[in-house]
Amino acid sequence: MQKDQQKLIELIKGKKVAFIGAGVSHKTLIKEFVELGAHVTLCDQKKSVEDFGDYAATIKELGIDLSLGENYLDGFKGQDIIMRTPGFVGYFEKPLPDAMAAGTMVTSEVELFFDFCPCEIVAVTGSDGKTTTTTLISKFYEAAGRKVHLGGNIGAALLPMLPEVAPEDVAVVELSSFQLISMHSSPNIAVVTNVTPNHLDHHKDMQEYIDAKRNILLYQKQPCRAVLGYENEISRSMQSDCKGKQVWFTRLHDTDNGAFLRKEDNMLCMAEDGVVTPFLAQKDVKLRGLHNIENLLAAAAAVWGEVPVEAIQKVGSTFTGVEHRIEPVRTLDGVLYYNDSIGTSPTRTIAGLRSFNQKVILIAGGYDKHIPYEPLAPEVVAHVKNLVLMGATGPRIEKAVREDPNFNEAELPIQHADNMQHAVELARACAKPGDIIILSPASASFDLYPNFEVRGREFKKIVNELK
């Protein structure tokens, strides 16, 4: 048994531990914590044990205490450790600060992994591009022969992997603002892709969202590396937070310190210590969209010097993308269908629209995260020929588009759909051979779906069943 794992066992054994919610990762951890000798209380808004469905039998079998219903957070009292879930908002509001003031340790699955992980950690955050950048980094290491543990906001829970993690391995972690908000550890290599308004339905304000992202940098220890997006004003401003080596990635500018797209020959290059190394031609990149060139530059800057250039070249010239990210679905009657359900914010949808060299038929709208849609409007006017809207944000998107000075209703018809099936039918009805229909909602999914993955898969199912 590794000493890091032994330290974790010593932390948990005999302690009173409260878990907020029984999500997928917590279900795994609850069982492990009970087996390690912890006395576990599950705090959840559900009203009875039967409301947990199939998991109710496990609760009874493990002897877990329950604190349920409206006052479920009363279960925090008298606990040694509180395991926070990323979905639990209000970190700085009562009763968590009260519990911390009373000496209770408030932590999370990802935080404990960072505290006890024996190997190098590379982590990525940002409003857009996190998953693609994280995936590219993991594939770069795999191509170089390193054993990779992929997790965080992508893949599986990391803490249960701890017994399998060796010092020579590498952990590649995607981190959301909800995971970062309470963290007091930072990775060896940190990447901030960009920071734009997002999740303002959960964060107190934009500053709290930015401060959460900054935590990926604030606790780095030498030797360390920070990769920041130069084009984004907020990520660029985080240079002052960096504790060690800092490099940029930029598509629009040259730099002598980081990864960039060289304009004269469209080569992706890395500049470091006075040496510029071209490593991949833009024409050889299989990923669609200029935003994915930025993701590739960010990933390359993160691993530069850690893996052979050949590993970056191999992955960069063969990787075609992640599900739900401008994902080709099918061609029917000459019409191309794309699933970009990851488009949960205006900036993501803008990147998707700019990936095509023709106007598209756009399906958009969904759950309202209280983010502004004015920046989306001119992009819709410039890149969309028919707009199909649904969900709570549909009227807000329509209002922003109609108020754009270049909007012309004759050139951009707007329709509203009751659901995804209806939206696909409306989009198909106005499509001609050669047209592109893309689902890129510029909104979260929670009004109709548990997450963007379920939304994207329903879209693909509907499209694939069209006759």
What are these regions (language model features)?
Residues 56-57, 376-434:
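C-terminal helical cap/extension that packs against the catalytic core
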Residues 1-108, 112:
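N-terminal leader/targeting and accessory segments in enzymes
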Residues 41-44, 69-70, 107-111, 243-262, ...:
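Beta-strand->loop->alpha-helix junctions that form or flank phosphate-binding loops
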Residues 33, 82, 124, 153, ...:
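Residue-level signal for inorganic ion chemistry
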Residues 40-44, 150, 172, 248, ...:
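Short beta-strand "acidic-cap" motif of Rossmann-like dinucleotide-binding folds
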Residues 74-77, 86-230, 234-244, 429, ...:
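Phosphate-binding loop of NTP-binding sites
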Residues 3, 8-16, 26-36, 147, ...:
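Nucleotide phosphate-binding/pyrophosphate-handling subdomain across enzymes
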Residues 39-47, 227-230, 363-364, 383-392:
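Short internal beta-strands
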